[in-house]
């Protein structure tokens, strides 16, 4: 689907712009057939692998009602990295939920948060 001259799809998420590069990735929300639906999160890319997968770590605050205190928690989410995006480990990224791509991958990176 990543032919030259093809229009880039609008993902419909505010604050996310389409990449300037094109790709032929089937699981790209801009040039492929993958639709983004569900929740949109922000996190830090802590691991990027060669087969276009990565791990995003997200920190959030949880309120413990028994002790009336807040605590910091972390969650790690496995994501797909489209080949048209230039991301590296340590980048703050915006991810969106999609249909399951693999056994543990249901999110895709939409862009780098500046």
Swiss-Prot record:
Pfam families: Ribosomal_S17. Signal peptide: none annotated. InterPro entries: NA-bd_OB-fold, Ribosomal_uS17, Ribosomal_uS17_arc/euk, Ribosomal_uS17_archaeal. It comes from the Archaea. Gene3D superfamilies: 2.40.50.1000. The keyword Ribonucleoprotein applies. GO terms for molecular function: rRNA binding; structural constituent of ribosome. GO terms for biological process: translation. Keywords: Ribonucleoprotein, Ribosomal protein, RNA-binding, rRNA-binding. GO terms for cellular component: cytosolic small ribosomal subunit. Part of the 30S ribosomal subunit. One of the primary rRNA binding proteins, it binds specifically to the 5'-end of 16S ribosomal RNA. HAMAP family: Ribosomal_uS17_A. PANTHER family: 40S RIBOSOMAL PROTEIN S11 FAMILY MEMBER, 40S RIBOSOMAL PROTEIN S11-RELATED. Belongs to the universal ribosomal protein uS17 family. This is Small ribosomal subunit protein uS17.
């Amino acid at each position: 689907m990543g032919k030259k001259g093809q229009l880039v799809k609008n993902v419909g998420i505010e604050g996310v712009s389409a990449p300037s590069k094109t790709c032929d990735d089937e699981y790209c929300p801009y040039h492929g057939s993958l639709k983004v639906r569900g929740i949109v999160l922000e996190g830090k890319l802590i691991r990027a692998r060669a087969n276009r997968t990565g791990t995003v770590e997200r920190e959030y605050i949880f309120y413990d009602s028994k002790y009336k205190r807040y605590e910091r928690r972390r969650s790690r989410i496995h994501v797909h990295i489209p080949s048209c995006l230039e991301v590296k480990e340590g980048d703050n990224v915006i991810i969106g939920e999609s249909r399951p791509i693999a056994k543990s991958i249901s999110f895709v990176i939409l862009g780098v948060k500046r």
